Amino acid sequence: MAAARRLRTLQSQPENKVCVDCSQKNPQWASISYGIFMCLECSGKHRGLGVHISFVRSVTMDSWSEIQIKKMDAGGNERLNNFLAQYGISKETDIISKYNSNAASVYRDRIQALAEGRQWRDPPIVKESVGGGLMNKKPPLSQGGGRDSGNGGWDNWDNDDSFRSTDMRRNQSAGDFRSSGGRGAPAKSKSSEDIYSRSQLEASAANKESFFAKRMAENESKPEGLPPSQGGKYVGFGSSPGPAPRSNQQSGGGDVFSVMSEGFGRLSLVAASAANVVQTGTMEFTSKVKEGGLDQTVSETVNVVASKTTEIGQRTWGIMKGVMAIASQKVEEFTKEEASTWNQQNKTEGNGYYQNSGIGNKTANSSFGGSQSSSSGHNNSYRNSNSWDDWGEENNSKKEAAPKVSTSNDDDDGGWAGWDDNDAKDDDFYYQPASDKKSVGHNGKSDTAWTGGGFL
């Protein structure tokens, strides 16, 4: 903030409100090398001079150091113009000529010394002619005769009067010269066929070739590794390529690429040789086979092997086909037998059930003389519940023991009393209350038999 404030203070001074090199007001750029303020257009020209001549900064957009602020304090637009005026350089002088002058160099040294706090004493003033300096100097015009260095009028190439008859070029013709005040003015863009003979052109070409050959020989004699400004060799367009570095080893090379290329070349040679050998061997073997009749024997052997293979394959397929047919037949027979066995068992059990039911009814009728329909109906229900437990046993009714006779007088509990008294006779009795709510006992044949695993 302090640097910006000091810059605004310097910028607000009357002599700094106008550009140092032109009349543009309110400059926003500065050259630290001289401590001056300038406009945008002039700052671009100062940048073209280089930072060693003029170091340009923006007043508002760039950061400033303390030494740079001190340089701006030591300088000023009016001070610079007054200093350069002592050397004969005005404000309107071209920027390139002005700041490349000796006076500008002295002023830069002065600003640097004052900013660093060193003592400074101005050197003696020597007037400079910027217009006659190196930047604006022009070669003198040719004044005719022998005082001219023979430049051929190239300083005034667009002026036909500047040419003399002695300065003929290859694009001029001798017949197109006209006399004017003792000097001839050639016409432009003319052919040179009438100026030089063929022998002269050939001699000129030979001289040109010898000249360039001499130059190339001189270039070859120069050392390598040095720039041309220090006496080194020129390398570029028109130069012969430098010799490739050769390795001291004869069998290989230090360069990886050369080794790889050499290896691939050798590999290709080996592959080509191997291919030739294989081709030659194949041709020899073929010729020998044909000469000895081996080709016919080989073909016969191949035919025999093929026929045997086909026969074996057909036999194997026939065997497998027969095995599959037998297996399918066996599976079908087993399925049919299982189905017939299942149907026969169901039919046998049904017949035995109805026989037992009939026997039970007859016994009940002979014993009690009544309640036939009730007893028969309940026997059917009981048989249906027990028929699935012994479906695998045939003629179960024929193998059962003789029934036991028992009566029951329990009218209220329907035979459920005493079911847990472990009485063996409970296993052979079946109690069924009558339709008129009277308990009826019968000596029916039992359809179940007790085993260790339960009822069957």
Swiss-Prot record:
Ranges of biased composition (kind: Low complexity): 365-387
Residue spans, zinc finger C4-type: 19-42
UniProt tissue specificity: Expressed in leaves, stems, flower buds and flowers.
Bias type Acidic residues, positions: 409-426
Comp. bias (Gly residues): 143-153
GO molecular function, one term: zinc ion binding
UniProt record, GO biological process: vesicle-mediated transport
Assigned keywords, A-Z: ER-Golgi transport, Golgi apparatus, GTPase activation, Metal-binding, Phosphoprotein, Transport, Zinc, Zinc-finger
Regulation: Activated by binding to phosphatidic acid.
Biased composition (Polar residues): 340-364
One GO cellular component, as annotated: Golgi apparatus
Sequence ranges of Basic and acidic residues compositional bias: 161-170
Gene3D superfamilies the UniProt entry points to: Arf GTPase activating protein (1.10.220.150)
Modified residues (Phosphoserine): 173, 191
Arf-GAP domain segment(s): 4-120
Cellular location(s): Golgi apparatus
One Pfam family from the record: ArfGap
InterPro entries named among the record's database cross-references: ARF_GAP_AGD6/7 (IPR044519), ARFGAP/RecO (IPR037278), ArfGAP_dom (IPR001164), ArfGAP_dom_sf (IPR038508)
Superkingdom of the source species: Eukaryota
First and last residue of the signal peptide: none
Segments for region (Disordered): 122-200, 216-257, 337-456
Assembly behavior: Interacts with ARF1.
UniProt function note: GTPase-activating protein (GAP) for ADP ribosylation factor (ARF). Involved in protein trafficking by controlling ARF1 activity; may participate in COPI vesicle formation at the Golgi complex.
Any further remark recorded for this protein: Plants overexpressing AGD7 show a relocation of proteins from the Golgi complex to the endoplasmic reticulum.
Protein name: ADP-ribosylation factor GTPase-activating protein AGD7
Origin species: Arabidopsis thaliana (Mouse-ear cress)
Gene that produces this protein: AGD7
